[in-house]
Amino acid sequence: SVGGGTQEVSQGLVKAMNYARDGETHIIGVAGRDGGALAIMADACVVVPEPADKSLSTPITESMQAVIWHLLVSHPALKRQKTAWEDK
């Protein structure tokens, strides 16, 4: 959810976060707008500021999500195996 979800609109997201919380796992996320339920429930949440042109909110937030997830999965401390281009 670009906006981080609400109990009414993003029931699946909220349910997944409740499930994670019940399983004693950490919740991290990246959301736009005000961060919604994700910003409230997450242990760590990057909230991407809403641009002046609100029509760009979704593409900018999703772009930032992609950058942050890529940084996470590529971080040496978190990687479990080399990426394909590192084997060449």
Regions found by a protein language model. Give the residues of each.
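Glycine-rich phosphate-binding loops that contact phosphosugars or nucleotide phosphates
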Residues: 1-85
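Basic, amphipathic alpha-helical segments enriched in Lys/Arg and hydrophobic/aromatic residues
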Residues: 88
